[in-house]
């Protein structure tokens, strides 16, 4: 079976084509194409602008994916799209494209939960069996474990997502959004040496990032670092934190919180595996810190590279095809988007 997946819940538009061989052998990625809407430094991406980007690129990416996969429309069994969670306008633009292709090609639709897509793609690529999942991105921060055909949320952010915290601080510093603000924060943090004290907020298996963001924004303003970088920054005063120091401190603090709640979930469910998914999961420092914790517990950490960590269409095709093979379909009249589509709302029929 072959599925085409369309992802557009935020600023990345992805089209992926996945093959599940009839003999039950390992699924194959036939195409995985992505195009990103990049806003100017110091600015986020507005839903209307992002949706306009997706509408203008989706047909081009679908055609390119079909060429790369070397298949025709006749070979496609179903069209999978992100039903939620995500930003309303971008989600809607991709859902409209999926409906159009469904009607044009006469193919059935499968609405996919974005978070479940990340989990299933991570499981496929890494070969992890039943891990505790840390899902970290610009819009979500959740600690998840599978039980009784649901991906249960054991802990999550109480306010903003960790990726949103990092992205918004990048705006404060006027760091470039190309290729991604979080990536540029990570590169700057590697140069940091001074650890600045920041709030640390963990409640059980939940955490909060808004207070940390407010605190570090205030520090950046007090040291004159909130704006475009000046040539004289960091010169002459070794006691004054630099941009790199602030990025380093922010990463160390928020990642320590994530490691703590993940370890607590591992102890609760008795797992020795951690799977990190979502865009922030690409961060090498997060993977390193999580690895130290897991090794101390006699466990292991699984993560993917940017092809599969960052939002992509192939994860939607993978999760959609798993659901499609169990008989799941999304009727045209129900092919709407749900911005707050919870991970544990999905009945995971394809797992025991």
UniProtKB/Swiss-Prot annotation:
The lineage of its organism: Eukaryota, Fungi, Dikarya, Ascomycota, Pezizomycotina. Component of the EKC/KEOPS complex that is required for the formation of a threonylcarbamoyl group on adenosine at position 37 (t(6)A37) in tRNAs that read codons beginning with adenine. The complex is probably involved in the transfer of the threonylcarbamoyl moiety of threonylcarbamoyl-AMP (TC-AMP) to the N6 group of A37. Kae1 likely plays a direct catalytic role in this reaction, but requires other protein(s) of the complex to fulfill this activity. The EKC/KEOPS complex also promotes both telomere uncapping and telomere elongation. GO terms for cellular component: chromatin; cytoplasm; EKC/KEOPS complex; nucleus. Keywords: Activator, Acyltransferase, Cytoplasm, Metal-binding, Nucleus, Transcription, Transcription regulation, Transferase, tRNA processing. The keyword tRNA processing applies. One of its GO terms (biological process) is positive regulation of transcription by RNA polymerase II. It catalyses: L-threonylcarbamoyladenylate + adenosine(37) in tRNA = N(6)-L-threonylcarbamoyladenosine(37) in tRNA + AMP + H(+). This is tRNA N6-adenosine threonylcarbamoyltransferase. A divalent metal cation binds at residues 114, 118, 135, 311. It comes from Aspergillus fumigatus (strain ATCC MYA-4609 / CBS 101355 / FGSC A1100 / Af293).
